């Protein structure tokens, strides 16, 4: 009697985008991060990008960094050697404000900030 073979595909998300605005292209952001990390010789264990309000990021900045100022990004880095693991919090208010000031699209500015966050983990 012939035996049956089964192939299971397990897809593990190594990059999460939480509360990502509809205006941002998740796939473009993901590809940019993967290409950047790989080009520098690192790997990704798990990255969580959290898009939060100006007020929420200010609260995190006060609580964990003792800074009473607005910022565009805060990175909590849990990486070991060259395997990146981090929680990254991004203020869409700051992204939108910087995009206007720098005459950039919101997506281009978001790409810059998302890249900035992962670079925090690489020194």
Predicted segments with their positions:
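Nucleotide phosphate-binding/pyrophosphate-handling subdomain across enzymes
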Residues: 116
């Amino acid at each position: 009697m012939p035996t049956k073979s089964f192939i299971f595909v397990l897809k593990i998300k190594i990059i999460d985008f939480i509360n990502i605005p509809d205006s941002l292209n998740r796939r473009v952001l993901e590809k940019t991060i993967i290409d950047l990390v790989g080009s520098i010789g690192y790997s990704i264990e798990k990255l969580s990008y959290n898009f939060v309000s100006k007020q929420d990021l200010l609260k995190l900045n006060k609580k964990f960094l003792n800074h009473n100022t607005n910022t565009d990004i805060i990175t909590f880095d849990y990486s070991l050697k060259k395997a990146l693991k981090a929680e990254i919090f991004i203020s869409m208010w700051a992204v939108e404000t910087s995009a206007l000031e720098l005459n950039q699209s919101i997506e281009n500015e978001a790409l810059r900030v998302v890249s900035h966050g992962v670079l925090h983990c690489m020194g």
